[in-house]
């Protein structure tokens, strides 16, 4: 099916709900913060709980799943073949303890419902069908580490004090069992141990602290409790079956112990099958589960990657089958935006192969929703050079929405009515970077050297900006040479 596959009159999208898995090495991903992308159904924007206000970054702006579906042609024109959306599940809309909202999707209250701001299950299915009808794929962001902030445990004068977030909007505890057992003062709920009853993480370098403490006051799930693991398998497996999701991006991976991942993803237990088993049952034999394991390392250091790579597991006991490439992102900003020596990229590429076995398991990006945009500290030419590098090495390119329209604000809206949009839509298919990214996607498609090649840097600088030249030798004997000036 080509680009003629548009939504039909019923608005249900024209593709199949379930399609076979692609080779992920050949994909280009467009990452959308759904609330800030496009408002396709204005009726769901304001749920009248004081949670909607496009004039502030802290509240909902109105973007939704219908909006993403309506812009599939725009995304496809960039050369993107998959769309990664922020978590669409029912969220805590407003947390009065921190005066901020859950528009971003990472503060769940029910893992098996679509958030009312995002739309309905039917609209989610329509997005899936529309993507599939265009030969594209759907990646859902998931969060097994925590729910929203419905309680706090504060250490006051050496004693743990339990505080309920009673004014949380729209609910003061999750509406889904067993995640609704948030009351530490209730002995039965405390004993159910759905959560780690802990204060905030005090030492991020200490495994036990990181795995069991609350991250930013978010209620930390006890992922070593089989009841929790089975509920997470059921909840997230549901979206593969019900919405035709083709892959997961997994949030906050390093905040969960290693033992969880093999069971959650790969278990063949018929009573509580893992995600991969559930995906296979829908015909997806190459379901992707790539994770965020953000470890700042610094130039010429592989310390961060050693921890990150450990979440791939082993052949006998696999864990995630892809990881976001934070160390390369940091080096790309240093080299292409800050004029540092290009030999740090040469060093990094070699180091990544050593740590991960292959560059193809990595998901590359220049910026994302949790950091300053590349263009906040660099010009368009710098960004173009960084993107050329990213599209001519193995590792799946991920483009954060708005990059193609020269966005500098990390969570600004693409649509006129949304937060910090400047009062206009930003879907210009003639923009310089939109056309440039489309041409890079075509270039990448032209040779397996770019998607599966062995990369050798043969010229780089030891001080300051300058040449970066490398060859990519593909498995089919083709060689591509890329030369750029950083």
Give a label for each model feature.
Residues 1-18:
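Bacterial Sec-dependent N-terminal signal peptides
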Residues 372-376:
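Surface-exposed cleft-lining segments at the edges of enzyme active sites
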Residues 21-27, 35-243, 263-268, 273, ...:
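Substrate-binding/active-site clefts of carbohydrate-active enzymes
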Residues 11, 128, 146, 234-358, ...:
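Active-site-proximal helices and loops of the catalytic beta/alpha 8
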Residues 28-33, 81-87, 105-113, 137-144, ...:
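Structural recognition of the beta-strand scaffold that forms the well-ordered cores
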Residues 16-19, 350-352:
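Short, P/G- and charge-enriched loop/turn segments at secondary-structure junctions
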Residues 19-20, 279:
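Beta-strand elements of modular eukaryotic interaction domains
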Residues 383:
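Conserved interdomain hinge at the start of the Helicase C-terminal
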